[in-house]
């Protein structure tokens, strides 16, 4: 019982510290410059003037991550119509992202955060068996480069629709 209680306290503490480092709505989005699935570095500033959906996910080729990526791909025409760019981020390398994009026919960029520094800057890191992974969180960044909406602990199958709805609301205000 003592070990179980200690584990719960550790998990609560880890969640609390992650929540404290997650950028808040209205804050400037931490800069991102990472290699993409195409091998070229991509910066968040490359998309200034556009809405950006920056979504973090744990691992290429896993069921939840594949489902989430497929949902974003399915809705890509709607995001394009809303003048929004989708950028996925995980700790996988560029080659893994390239293979994942090819297999799943993804037409948006995936960024390789192999040292998890960008994931950390966005409060989107979790540990699994001693390895750092990106946590499943999403940030909508407005055309001025500020955080407009934060989603944590998302459901991969329905998340794309949730983001589209939030984007439509944000663009109205």
Residues of each region from the PLM?
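N-proximal helix/coil linker or "cap" segments that precede and/or mark the start of modular domains
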Residues: 3-31
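A short beta-strand-turn-helix
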Residues: 23, 32-51
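Short loop/turn microsegments at loop-to-beta-strand junctions
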Residues: 29-30, 51, 135-137
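Structural microenvironment flanking redox-active thiols in thiol-disulfide oxidoreductases
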Residues: 64-106, 114-118
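Structural micro-motif
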Residues: 106-108, 125-128, 132-139
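Thiol-/selenol-based redox modules, centered on thioredoxin-like
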Residues: 133-173
């Amino acid at each position: 019982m003592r070990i179980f209680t200690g584990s719960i306290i550790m998990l609560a503490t880890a969640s609390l510290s992650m929540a404290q480092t997650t950028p808040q709505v209205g804050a400037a989005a931490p800069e991102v410059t990472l290699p993409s699935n195409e091998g070229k570095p991509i910066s968040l500033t490359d998309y200034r003037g556009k809405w950006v959906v920056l979504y973090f996910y744990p691992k290429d080729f896993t069921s939840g991550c594949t489902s989430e990526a497929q949902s974003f791909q399915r809705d890509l025409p709607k995001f394009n119509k809303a003048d929004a760019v989708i950028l996925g981020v995980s700790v996988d390398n560029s080659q893994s992202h390239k293979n994942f994009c090819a297999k799943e026919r993804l037409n948006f960029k995936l960024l390789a955060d192999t040292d998890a520094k960008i994931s950390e800057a966005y409060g989107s890191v979790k540990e699994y068996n001693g390895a750092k992974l990106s946590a499943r969180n999403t940030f909508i960044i407005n055309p001025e480069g500020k955080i407009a909406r934060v989603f944590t602990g998302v459901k991969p199958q329905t998340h794309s629709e949730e983001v589209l709805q939030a984007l439509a609301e944000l663009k109205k205000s």
